[in-house]
Amino acid sequence: MSDEPIFEEEMGETELREEAMNWWQRGYQAQMRQQLDEAIEHYTRSIEIFPTAEAYTFRGWAKSLQGKLDEAIEECIKAIEVDPDYGNPYNDIGAYLIQKGDMRGAIPWLERAFDTNGYECPFYPRFNLGRVYEEFGDLLKAVNLYKEAYDLNPNYKQALLAFRRLQARLN
């Protein structure tokens, strides 16, 4: 085995994916330490090696934490272009639009997140959509969405609290 560095041009798809994942993991670790600029650099390196929906989505999340919501939305759109079945960016766009005060604009994005197969946290878009309908005064729809979110993840206490709060208002 040679001590020569392996250049990306010489790597196969599997190796490129693995290398990109290593950079993504570095980015995630930096983000968890609140080192957002470093995280963005690592996510960017991951994308340069092998673009993935995860890297774009998480780079968007890091940018959102810097208050760059429009850039975060752009990153999520790139993620969807790479993998339309990855659910996180749909929910994230909805959440960023909620933060921007565009409740109506958030609805189709959150609803699309329901229908994706590649989403490990399907309770988030239901909770976020519940927030939208609560804001619009449709408390029955909101309480049902909070309940769905809680049913999908009984450890998601925020959904349980919102469900109980609205249930009490409706009674």
What are these model-predicted stretches?
Residues 47, 80, 114-116, 150, ...:
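A conserved position within tetratricopeptide repeats
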Residues 3-22, 116-120:
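TPR-adjacent "capping" and linker segments in tetratricopeptide-repeat scaffold/adaptor proteins
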Residues 22, 55-56, 89, 123-125, ...:
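TPR alpha-solenoid repeat register
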